[in-house]
């Protein structure tokens, strides 16, 4: 049938050409129902269809093909009504479906305003792919609303297997100056793979994964997957208690885990039983996952994220990940995850140059690229980008009940000259090196999390002396809950790696951390970064033969658990893994049952005991962040490599911690203490239970009224070589 090009059911050639090439800002202006002076017209593009019938008023009408796979019909002058399209493709039964171009925009004006201002705190509910249900005159219509931010694009479309990846089938409409593109597609359900076909100003089509996708295909595939959740949480009591708890005065020992290599081949469902049981048995209060957001390259350990809103599909579905978190909560264990807002990879199907131009990344290469890592840096000063990141932090806490975010590479965000040579960075407006936009972002993120989710943690991996990392934002600080103490980690590992005969010359490396221990709210981290890239495992760093390595590692762990600050230990170190961590294989569990395995089982037993003593002793955790919780008893005995200090609880309890870091026992070591009475031995790393050498230490010691070391009382202690003892003052 030939249609007069001037007919009101046709589309002007200029608009038709733009629709054909998916670079029209308003496809809804031509597809769907339209009123003209000559009457009502309905048009639809159905690529490859042989016939399309309009179903309206209980009647079927054959629509006219007008070229370019477009079908149209003139309904004359009549009132608008609900309708369906019956589409026939070759060798297929006809399909009846609602018209995507019948529906009003799914994004409201207030949503657009909040996003443009960078203040939409539930951004995932309007951007990305959201399943929606509408009640119409002809019945319920269920489908997916797609929305993407691409302000520099000249056209956007939704593509997937449902339309043969043909961008002309489902072009999206522009939502004006907001930069948003939107389309509701009936019939698209959970599990459908899709991308956004973005037409750039240079005339190129770039198929992009959805930045807001809640699920992604398993790598190396790069598609996004429509997802919704039916998960029924069982942790309401946990969340209630979390909102009322200040962890500053609570025990916090964190087991850091790379989910893919804890035990090789395990998925979220397996881990919800095996990992949860293991962490609970050892007495940890929290677990911390290396990044679980979707990432294409396993060798990045998750630190080069392409899907910020999608748990990686490597180990299961989003709801299976929810069940893993829920299982930890059921055992009283909090869940922290590493979060990477500092930078993102250059993969051309992801965030990089999303709409053909710098969008998520800063447009100035001096601020928009991290050459050391080969990644791009977010444009923290752009409202929409800042909103994307702040909302992402909230998303993990709200949708997955995550208890804390450990923010990676904070130093790289704070300093404009981070890892840059002269001429490779631009000063801020005041001529300084501080990245003021990143500072504002971090303050906003931390303040928003605190306001909406009291009790949820934000933890900074920040390796410099930036002031006020954990100070409140209202006092000019960054507002983090906690900060990793990288100085303590470096100095302590350096000291323990020395042969005991040389340690006297490095005594200050062990004591210096107490100079600044209360300047921030610190976590003591022995993380994955310390057991890779040729650094060796903790076991490997300890000097001497097998017995001495085991004794040194036991003493190191006791020192860490008694030092002010919360604790974090990477998986494998709890049993003294001998080799470096490798993400491509599981932990060497067989070492515990193999030759000399008794040493490794003893270290794991000590880890369990340390967690128990730590959690049960207010003196070791209630005053981590104040000098009132600590005093030196002996900090200057470098000659004997002996340290001793007392930790004080907010309840008045006291724990004396004594360390002999030499190879020589001290059978009658005289030590001043603050209080008289009985001091009971609660932990001895040299005990037979831990395969120590000397087991004849008195289980309690009575303080004598003999002044020593500026204290009114003193103890005479047997302090074995390479060991630690904790003594609790009995009331």
Curated annotation (Swiss-Prot):
Coiled coil: none
Role, per record: Catalyzes the formation of the alpha-1,6-glucosidic linkages in glycogen by scission of a 1,4-alpha-linked oligosaccharide from growing alpha-1,4-glucan chains and the subsequent attachment of the oligosaccharide to the alpha-1,6 position.
Biological processes annotated in GO: glycogen biosynthetic process
Keywords of the record: Carbohydrate metabolism, Glycogen biosynthesis, Glycogen metabolism, Glycosyltransferase, Transferase
Protein EC: 2.4.1.18
EC supergroup of this enzyme: transferase
Protein name: 1,4-alpha-glucan branching enzyme GlgB
Taxonomic classification: Bacteria, Bacillati, Actinomycetota, Actinomycetes, Mycobacteriales
Recorded GO MF terms: 1,4-alpha-glucan branching enzyme activity; cation binding; hydrolase activity, hydrolyzing O-glycosyl compounds
Domain of life: Bacteria
GO cellular component: cytosol
Presence of keyword Glycosyltransferase: yes
This protein's record includes keyword Glycosyltransferase: yes
Disulfide-linked positions: none
Gene3D superfamilies: Glycosidases, Golgi alpha-mannosidase II, Immunoglobulins
Subunit text: Monomer.
Record field: catalytic activity: Transfers a segment of a (1->4)-alpha-D-glucan chain to a primary hydroxy group in a similar glucan chain
Gene for this chain: glgB
Pathway note: Glycan biosynthesis; glycogen biosynthesis
Pfam families: Alpha-amylase, Alpha-amylase_C, CBM_48, GlgB_N
Family statement drawn from the similarity comment of this UniProt entry: Belongs to the glycosyl hydrolase 13 family. GlgB subfamily.
Active site residues according to the UniProt entry: 408 (nucleophile), 461 (proton donor)
């Amino acid at each position: 049938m030939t249609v007069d090009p001037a007919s009101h059911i046709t589309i002007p050639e200029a608009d038709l050409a733009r629709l054909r090439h998916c670079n029209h800002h308003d496809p809804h202006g031509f597809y769907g129902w339209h009123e003209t002076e000559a009457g009502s017209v309905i048009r639809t593009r159905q690529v490859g269809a042989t016939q399309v019938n309009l179903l309206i008023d209980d009647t079927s009408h054959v629509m006219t093909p007008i070229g370019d796979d477009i079908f149209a019909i003139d309904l004359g002058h009549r009132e608008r009504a609900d309708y369906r399209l019956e589409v026939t493709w070759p060798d297929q039964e006809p399909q009846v479906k609602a018209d995507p171009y019948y529906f009003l925009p799914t994004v409201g004006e207030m949503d657009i305003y909040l996003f443009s201002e960078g203040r939409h705190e539930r951004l995932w509910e309007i951007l990305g792919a959201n399943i929606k249900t509408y009640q119409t005159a002809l019945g319920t219509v269920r489908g997916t609303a797609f929305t993407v931010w691409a302000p520099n694009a000249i056209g956007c479309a939704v593509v997937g297997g449902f339309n043969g990846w043909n961008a002309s089938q489902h072009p999206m409409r522009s939502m004006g100056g907001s930069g948003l593109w939107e389309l509701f597609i009936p019939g698209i359900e959970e599990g459908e793979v899709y991308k956004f076909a973005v037409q750039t100003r240079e005339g190129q089509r770039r198929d992009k994964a959805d930045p807001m996708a809640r699920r992604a295909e398993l790598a190396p595939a790069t598609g996004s997957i429509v997802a919704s959740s039916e998960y029924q949480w069982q942790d309401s009591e946990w969340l209630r208690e979390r909102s009322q708890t200040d962890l500053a005065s609570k025990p916090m020992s964190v087991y850091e885990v790379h989910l893919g290599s804890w035990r090789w081949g395990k998925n979220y469902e397996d881990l919800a039983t095996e990992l949860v049981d293991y962490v609970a048995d050892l007495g940890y209060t929290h677990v911390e996952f290396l990044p679980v957001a979707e990432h294409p390259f396993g060798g990045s350990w998750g630190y080069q994220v392409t899907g910020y809103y999608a748990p990686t599909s490597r180990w299961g579905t989003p709801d299976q990940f929810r069940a893993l978190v829920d299982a930890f909560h059921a055992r009283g264990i909090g869940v922290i995850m590493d979060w990477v807002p500092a930078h993102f990879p250059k993969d051309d199907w992801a965030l990089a140059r999303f709409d053909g131009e710098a969008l998520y990344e800063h447009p100035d290469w001096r601020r928009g690229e991290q050459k050391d890592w080969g990644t791009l840096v977010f444009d923290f000063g752009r409202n929409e980008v800042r909103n994307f990141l702040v909302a992402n932090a909230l998303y993990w806490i709200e949708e997955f009940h995550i208890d804390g975010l450990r923010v990676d590479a904070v130093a790289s965000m704070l300093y404009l000259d981070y890892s840059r040579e002269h001429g490779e960075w631009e000063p801020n407006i005041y001529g300084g090196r501080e990245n003021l936009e990143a500072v504002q972002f971090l303050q906003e993120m931390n303040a928003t999390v605190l306001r909406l989710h009291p009790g949820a943690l934000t933890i900074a991996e920040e390796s410099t002396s930036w002031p006020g990392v954990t100070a409140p934002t209202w006092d000019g600080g960054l507002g983090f809950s906690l900060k990793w103490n990288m100085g303590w980690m470096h100095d302590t590992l350096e000291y323990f790696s020395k042969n005991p005969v040389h340690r006297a010359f490095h005594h200050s490396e062990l004591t210096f951390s107490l100079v600044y221990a209360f300047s921030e709210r610190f976590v003591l981290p022995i993380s994955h970064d310390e057991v890779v890239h040729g650094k060796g495992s903790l076991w490997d760093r300890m000097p001497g033969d097998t017995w001495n390595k085991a004794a040194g590692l036991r003493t190191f762990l006791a020192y860490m658990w008694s030092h002010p600050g919360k604790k974090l230990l990477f998986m494998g170190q709890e049993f003294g893994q001998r080799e470096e961590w490798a993400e491509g294989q599981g932990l060497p569990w067989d070492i515990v049952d193999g030759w000399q395995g008794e040493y490794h089982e003893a270290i794991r037993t000590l880890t369990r005991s340390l967690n128990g003593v730590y959690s049960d002793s207010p003196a070791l955790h209630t005053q981590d962040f104040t000098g009132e919780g600590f005093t030196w008893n002996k900090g200057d005995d470098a000659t004997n490599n002996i340290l001793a200090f007392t930790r004080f609880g907010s309840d008045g309890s006291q724990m004396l911690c004594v360390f002999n870091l030499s190879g020589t026992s001290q059978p009658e070591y005289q030590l001043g203490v603050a209080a008289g009475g009985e001091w009971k031995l609660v932990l001895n790393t040299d005990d037979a239970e831990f395969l120590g050498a000397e087991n004849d230490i008195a289980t309690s010691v009575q303080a004598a009224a003999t002044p020593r070391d500026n204290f009114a009382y003193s103890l005479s202690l047997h302090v074995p070589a390479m060991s630690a003892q904790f003594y609790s003052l009995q009331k």
